Amino acid sequence: MPDYLGADQRKTKEDEKDDKPIRALDEGDIALLKTYGQSTYSRQIKQVEDDIQQLLKKINELTGIKESDTGLAPPALWDLAADKQTLQSEQPLQVARCTKIINADSEDPKYIINVKQFAKFVVDLSDQVAPTDIEEGMRVGVDRNKYQIHIPLPPKIDPTVTMMQVEEKPDVTYSDVGGCKEQIEKLREVVETPLLHPERFVNLGIEPPKGVLLFGPPGTGKTLCARAVANRTDACFIRVIGSELVQKYVGEGARMVRELFEMARTKKACLIFFDEIDAIGGARFDDGAGGDNEVQRTMLELINQLDGFDPRGNIKVLMATNRPDTLDPALMRPGRLDRKIEFSLPDLEGRTHIFKIHARSMSVERDIRFELLARLCPNSTGAEIRSVCTEAGMFAIRARRKIATEKDFLEAVNKVIKSYAKFSATPRYMTYN
């Protein structure tokens, strides 16, 4: 057989002394090999990971619930006897109304409750309820056997009224509102100063204004300022559109207004914003047909809640309208609406600021002369300037460019301000304000 490798490249065992003895690795060598390829903090990271695993294991043991398809605990952790006893002890309660408290100052007071469409009962309190928690006229939960009062219930409020409360704050701040510097200062004096520094009014012995009317042509920033107020304040903010209070059935709109202020009084501090208040706040008149009687009843209830027999509490009211000349004089008087803030057309500085605000979020070239653009848009509202910026972006998209140039803005001014002038209602609304 031919030797292809070659005798000089093949290792042959000539002497047993040439082979070195193989020594087994001890624990020190193994520990040294394990350190190869590790960083400085590998040991600390490993220790933290072990601690996390131990904590997760302990949490799962304490909760006794693991992720499963049914979402139930393992059968070994079920306590059917205790669950059955709980179901027997906690029975569903019936809703009733406490109409009168007998011997309220004594050690054993009695409570007269009225179960709707059933009967009236004189009952006691259960052991879980304190006598100070129950008041006359309050809704309570009673059991079905002895009709004892178990829990006090909150007042009944229409879900449509509850949904008017703004849970998530808008993303509009005062810096996003341009051309309304003076109006924002007046608004903050009414809304923020009484909430943040009430001692200033106490020292002077005056009550802060509780109502503000925002009026002006469409597109001047009335609703935008209200959104900025909602973002700024920590008080509960309720937004109501005037047309929502115009209901089909008699008395429904007035009931919604009552429940709206009833919910607002339960809050520590509350702001109610009525947008397009002229939908229900128009001057009263008799057209002979009686079609507007229900709207007038809703407005009368609103007038009574603003400054009637019952105190309003720490409730601030903002109202916005385009037609202040159509509002009822009783709604406009001081005490109900203490301050009237006019949102007029922005001046040159305001228009320049509005251009910069909208261009801030756009991809535009540098050194655009916003003051020149503002001079080319006389008697324009903030909404029209925003439309100019949008159209400038559309011109850039049409030309397949990634940034908008000054030429795009000039063409947008010619399109929006010049061409759409016949659609503008600003001059007509200026005569109303």
Curated annotation (Swiss-Prot):
Residues 8-22 have a biased composition (Basic and acidic residues). Monoubiquitinated by RNF181. Phosphorylated. Dephosphorylated by UBLCP1 which impairs PSMC2 ATPase activity and disrupts 26S proteasome assembly. GO terms for molecular function: ATP binding; ATP hydrolysis activity; proteasome-activating activity. It comes from the Eukaryota. It is found in: Cytoplasm. Pfam families: AAA, AAA_lid_3, PRS7_OB. GO terms for cellular component: cytoplasm; cytoplasmic ribonucleoprotein granule; cytosol; extracellular region; ficolin-1-rich granule lumen; membrane; nucleoplasm; nucleus. Keywords: Acetylation, ATP-binding, Cytoplasm, Nucleotide-binding, Phosphoprotein, Proteasome, Ubl conjugation. Induction: Expression is not cell cycle-dependent and occurs throughout the cell cycle. PROSITE patterns: AAA (PS00674). InterPro entries: 26S_Proteasome_ATPase (IPR050221), AAA+_ATPase (IPR003593), AAA_lid_3 (IPR041569), ATPase_AAA_core (IPR003959), ATPase_AAA_CS (IPR003960), NA-bd_OB-fold (IPR012340), P-loop_NTPase (IPR027417), PRS7-like_OB (IPR048723). Gene3D superfamilies: 1.10.8.60, Nucleic acid-binding proteins, P-loop containing nucleotide triphosphate hydrolases. Its main location: cytoplasm. GO terms for biological process: osteoblast differentiation; positive regulation of proteasomal protein catabolic process; proteasome-mediated ubiquitin-dependent protein catabolic process; ubiquitin-dependent protein catabolic process. The modification N6-acetyllysine is found at K116, K422. The keyword ATP-binding applies. ATP binds at G216, P217, P218, G219, T220, G221, K222, T223. The keyword Kinase does not apply. Residues 1-22 are annotated as: Disordered. Belongs to the AAA ATPase family. Component of the 19S proteasome regulatory particle complex. The 26S proteasome consists of a 20S core particle (CP) and two 19S regulatory subunits (RP). The regulatory particle is made of a lid composed of 9 subunits, a base containing 6 ATPases including PSMC2 and few additional components. Interacts with NDC80/HEC; this interaction is detected only during M phase. Interacts and SQSTM1. Interacts with PAAF1. Directly interacts with TRIM5. Component of the 26S proteasome, a multiprotein complex involved in the ATP-dependent degradation of ubiquitinated proteins. This complex plays a key role in the maintenance of protein homeostasis by removing misfolded or damaged proteins, which could impair cellular functions, and by removing proteins whose functions are no longer required. Therefore, the proteasome participates in numerous cellular processes, including cell cycle progression, apoptosis, or DNA damage repair. This is 26S proteasome regulatory subunit 7. It comes from Homo sapiens (Human). The gene is PSMC2.
